[in-house]
């Protein structure tokens, strides 16, 4: 199997990526709380793929540091990558329609009618 190397590992362990905002967490603007909260259903889905032996990836449009912070807060072990199209990623879960992996799933966004844009503070 060492001759096959990476090909065997890719078949055996697919790469599955999860976005942070509105996928692994629900932003405070959608909950009415003063803080972001874990999205229990999507975290359970993450753990299911993890239990199957997949290579788990967490990424965010907010950057790698933001993704790393949330991975640590949520207790999720994953590879942290820049959020961009990546031929290595087999499956991607995101709240937006994306083309970042071989197969892309759009998860349900809570209270979609509420804008996710941050309000600009005027000083």
What are the roles of these predicted feature ranges?
Residues 1-123:
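HAD-like aspartate-dependent phosphatase fold
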